[in-house]
Amino acid sequence: MKQIKWGILGTGSIAKAFAEALQETEGELIAVASTTKQRALEFSEPYGCEAIEGHRNLISLPGIDAIYIATPHTSHFEFAVECLKQKKAVLCEKPMTINATETMALIDLSRKNKTLLMEAFMYKIHPQTQKLAELVALRLSLIHI
């Protein structure tokens, strides 16, 4: 299997959790971008990856296969569009966008460019979701949540 080369947009706590988890995979963190060079440097140091000022500079960086978007949610759509246009796979923190129209536009662009688009949605393994699935499987007529 090909090793996935990652870039991370954002340097907050969720981006750090992703970078830590990435260390346990065969993926490689190539670069991280923040609004300031200093913030990117502080984040990148433990991972030995490149620190980039400006999110768009990371998106255009050659050699990156996939980008994890962990910026404020109002910027997700804009950054995801740029990534998909450059045929870079996108793993976007939730919510992927702030409305259904933007989400459908991303899905359409992803399909057009044959590029992966995925929301970082962890609720499939959440205990409440598993319990709900169990109850639905039992065909209970009334479910209270």
Short names for language-model regions:
Residues 1-47:
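N-terminal Rossmann-like dinucleotide-binding module
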Residues 29, 64-67, 140-141:
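Local beta-strand N-terminus motif with an aromatic residue
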Residues 49-55:
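Conserved SAM-binding strand-loop segment of SAM-dependent methyltransferases
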Residues 55-62:
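Short amphipathic alpha-helix with an adjacent loop that forms part of the alpha/beta core around
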Residues 66, 72-73, 77-122:
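Beta-strand-loop-alpha-helix segment that lines the small-molecule cofactor/substrate pocket
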Residues 108-116, 130-141:
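Basic phosphate/pyrophosphate-binding loop/patch that engages nucleotide-derived ligands
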